[in-house]
């Protein structure tokens, strides 16, 4: 590859990354705004974030985590 082609490819990659980083920042700001809105309507943001994490787990992993949590809570009497 010629130096010109390599330079152009590098610039394209960097440009795409910069664009995606900006989109990611914009999305993060939108998510923050949604959580603030939910909070102002009485929703517990911490609980919402926990639910979002749990939704990402498959059913077997979630059941395993729930069982372990229940075991620990029973052991500690909470």
Curated annotation (Swiss-Prot):
Protein name, as recorded: UPF0335 protein RBE_1185
Annotated InterPro entries: GapR-like, GapR-like_DNA-bd
GO molecular function, one term: DNA binding
Transmembrane segments: none
Organism domain of life: Bacteria
Family under the similarity heading: Belongs to the UPF0335 family.
